[in-house]
Structure formats: structure tokens, C-alpha cells
A protein has these predicted regions:
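C-terminal nucleotide
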Residues: 1-99, 111-148
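N-terminal pre-core extensions flanking Radical SAM catalytic domains
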Residues: 103-109
Length: 148
């Protein structure tokens, strides 16, 4: 896909016999653009824009990349279920984002929740997934650095 463009893909949609491949390709092109914009947002310390892009990326992973569940067993959709439950919580509090993270089919979700709602979210989501499966994390002001 690095050797073509979204416009070229769209010009040939009717010739491609794999709708899923088209959807996943659209994700690839859009995600590449999002990553560039996210890097710019971080460079400008525009964390609101970064979180917006992270949210868009997560929705695209779910809808277009389709890496939140395994096609072999469509009845088991743990990641989409936890994303939907988390989104209900976030809608209720009026803030935060969630997305699939990591391995996709066998991945986890990442939820960015306002600090003052963290304990409430942990309690809420634990009733569905078990407290042992919820890992609250902090975001450091400085990421990984090389010392020496």
C-alpha cells in the first residue's frame, strides 16, 4: 500500500473482490495521516488534538481495520463489548476516550479517563471484566529517554 494512494484505491474499488481488504486499506491510508498529525499535536503540546486523533484511530481500528474480534468466532467479541461499555461510561461523564490497543485480536483496550473519574471507572468496568483485569496507569511528563 505504500506504493499507491487512497485515491488510486478508490478508483479501483469496483474491481477489487474483497470488501474487507478495501476497508482495511482505507484504515491504512487514514491512519498514516493521523499518525503524522498526532506527532505534530504532541510537538505543539496540543493534547486535546492528540486525544481526538487517538479516538479517531481507535474507532477506525474497530470499524475499518476490524481487529477487535476474530472472524472465526463472531459470537465472542470481548474487545468490542468492553469498548462499548467504556463508551457508555465516558458518555455519561462527558469526557475521555477509549480504543483497542496492542495485539488487536488478542489485545486490550486503553481508556483515557479524567483523573477525577478514574476510581469510578475502575469500579464500573471491573464489574464486567474483573478487577484483576483492570490496570490503572499514569502518564509521565517525560517518556522514554536515553541516559548516558
Amino acid at each position: 500500500l505504500h506504493e499507491t494512494t487512497l485515491e488510486n484505491l478508490l478508483a479501483h474499488v469496483n474491481e477489487i473482490q474483497d470488501d474487507r481488504a478495501i476497508l482495511r486499506s482505507i484504515h491504512f491510508f487514514e491512519e498514516t495521516s493521523r499518525v503524522e498529525r498526532a506527532a505534530e499535536a504532541i510537538g505543539k503540546a496540543d493534547y486535546e488534538e492528540f486525544l481526538k486523533l487517538m479516538d479517531e484511530s481507535g474507532r477506525s481500528s474497530w470499524e475499518l481495520l476490524q481487529n477487535c474480534y476474530c472472524m472465526k468466532d463472531c459470537h465472542e467479541q470481548k474487545i468490542p463489548l468492553v469498548l462499548a461499555l467504556t463508551q457508555l461510561f465516558l458518555n455519561k461523564i462527558g469526557g475521555g476516550i477509549c480504543r483497542v490497543h496492542g495485539g488487536g485480536f488478542a489485545g486490550v483496550i486503553a481508556a483515557v479517563v479524567p483523573e477525577n473519574e478514574m476510581e469510578n471507572y475502575v469500579e464500573y468496568i471491573s464489574q464486567y471484566v474483573g478487577r484483576e483485569n483492570v490496570y490503572p496507569m499514569d502518564i509521565r511528563a517525560i517518556g522514554a529517554v536515553h541516559i548516558g
